[in-house]
Amino acid sequence: MVGKRLWVTGYRAYELNVFGSNDPKLKVLKTSLKNTLMQFLDEGLEWLITGGQLGVEQWAVEVALGLKPLYPDFKIAMMVPFTDFGKQWNEDNQGQLAALRGQVDFSDAVSQAPYQQPAQLQGYTRFITIHTDAALLVYDPEFPGKAKWDYQAAEAMADRRDYPVQLITMDDLEETAQAMAEAENEHFQND
């Protein structure tokens, strides 16, 4: 049981070489996220809490929004570290962030100031781990990325209290891709 509030984070899009919504890797990632979230929802998950980073965090929001018709009580929160989060992004990415923030049930900045110092990022991570019951990361320690810091923070919280940390690793993604390919092959054989 992951509890009622789940923090979802992981790799940035560029770390996975996913560039665009039609990338086949994205379908695998979203399928894996969907399957895991549905399992947690069936166990009593109420809130998905994530940030707005380009990559797993935004994809998790997209997947969660797609699950809301099946789980009408499911809530989504997008918390960003500071008020001007994403301002350095190109116009399309800023628009995507704004659109997602407009669709979730709750969105706010942890620090009510523009970016000033790295301590705001540490404060954000501390806030998220304190206000969630478990973490789900699309992350593999054998393939480090920026989510390494989130993984370390989640593991540190797990050392202090009951805080399950579940990873979707590269092997898990490979298994999902194989299952999807097998299902597609069966579909074509039955036609």
Curated annotation (Swiss-Prot):
Membrane-spanning segments: none
Superkingdom assignment: Bacteria
Record-linked InterPro entries: YspA
NCBIfam families registered for this protein in UniProt: PRK13660.1 (NF010181)
Family the entry assigns: Belongs to the UPF0398 family.
Protein name (Swiss-Prot/TrEMBL): UPF0398 protein LSEI_1479
Protein's organism: Lacticaseibacillus paracasei (strain ATCC 334 / BCRC 17002 / CCUG 31169 / CIP 107868 / KCTC 3260 / NRRL B-441) (Lactobacillus paracasei)
